[in-house]
Amino acid sequence: MAAAAAWTGAASPNSLLLSRSPPHAAALAPSPGSSMRRRLLLGVGTPAVAALAAAAPPAVLQDGAVTVLITAGAYSLVRVFDELTERRLIEKSLSRKVVHVLSGVLFMSSWPLFSNSTEARYFAAVVPFLNSMRLLIYGLRLYTDEALELLRGPLYYVLVLLFSVLVFWRESPIGIVSLSMMSGGDGFADIVGRRYGSAKLPFNRKKSWAGSISMFISGFLLSAMMMLYFSSLGYIDVIWEEALGKLALVALAATVVECVPVTEVVDDNISVPLATMLVAFLLFSSNRTIVN
C-alpha cells in the first residue's frame, strides 16, 4: 500500500522518500530467470541434503561425522610434523617415528567414538583407506628414494591399520595388541635405538640392545594400556592375572621377530603385526583369559 501511495501522490514526502524506487530500478531488478539461476547456484541441493540427513539413521550420521573428524585430525598431525621438520625443529627420522607412534595410538583411541552399529568399522576403515590412496598416488608420481620409501613402510603401516579395523575391530584383543606392538613397540625401538643404540646385536648389526629392550617394554606397556582402555569401556573383558603374562609373551615374540635380519625382505610394519596376530590368536583365543 505504501508503494502504491507513493506513486499516486497520496503519501507524505517522507513516505515518498522511503518507498519510491530510483528511475533505473526496474532495469537493475533481476529477471525471474536470473533469480532462478542464482538460487540454483547458491542453494542447489540444500533441501535434498537436509532431507537426506533427516532420514539417515543416527548411527550413520554419528559415524560419518567421526570419520570426517578423524580424517582431518590425521592429516593435521602429518602436516604439523612436516612443518616442524621443514623448520628444522625436529629431525626428519624422529618426526616420522613420532607420527608412526601417534597415528596408531590415536586411531585406536578414536574407535569408541563410532556407534555400535555393524557398519561402524567400515566408516573407521575409510581413514586408513584414504591415507593409503594418498601414499600410492604420491609415491607413484615420483621416481625418488623417498617415493620408494613411502611405498614400503608407511604404506604397509596404513594397510595393517585397514586390515585390523576390518577383521578385528575394537571387540578383539588380537587387533588391539597387534597395532600396539606395531605403533608403540616398533616406533620406540627405532627412536631409542638411534639415540642409545651403540651396543649392537651380535646377529644383526642394524639393531641394538637398547632398541630391542625398549620395544619389548613399550610394546608391552602400550598393549596393556590399550587393553585397559577398551575393557573399561566394556568392549572386552580381561582377566588380568592371566592376560599380563600372555601380553609379555606376545611382546617377546614381536621383539624377536623385529630383531631378525630380514628387513630387506619383509618390512617391520608387516612382520611385527603378523607375528603378533599369530601369537595373540594362539594365546588369547584358546581359553577364557579374554572373553569377548
Swiss-Prot record:
Its main location: plastid. Belongs to the polyprenol kinase family. It is an enzyme of class 2 (transferase). One of its GO terms (cellular component) is chloroplast. Disulfide bonds: none annotated. One of its GO terms (biological process) is vitamin E biosynthetic process. It catalyses: phytol + CTP = phytyl phosphate + CDP + H(+). Involved in the activation and reutilization of phytol from chlorophyll degradation in plant metabolism, including tocopherol biosynthesis. Catalyzes the conversion of phytol to phytol monophosphate (PMP). The chain crosses the membrane at residues 98-118, 120-142, 148-168, 216-236, 243-263, 265-285. Residues 1-49 form a transit peptide. It comes from the Eukaryota. Keywords: Chloroplast, Kinase, Membrane, Plastid, Transferase, Transit peptide, Transmembrane, Transmembrane helix. The lineage of its organism: Eukaryota, Viridiplantae, Streptophyta, Embryophyta, Tracheophyta. The keyword Chloroplast applies. Its EC number is 2.7.1.182. Pathway: Cofactor biosynthesis; tocopherol biosynthesis. It is a multi-pass membrane protein. GO terms for molecular function: phytol kinase activity. This is Probable phytol kinase 2, chloroplastic. The keyword Transmembrane applies. InterPro entries: Phytol/farnesol_kinase. It is found in: Plastid, Chloroplast membrane.
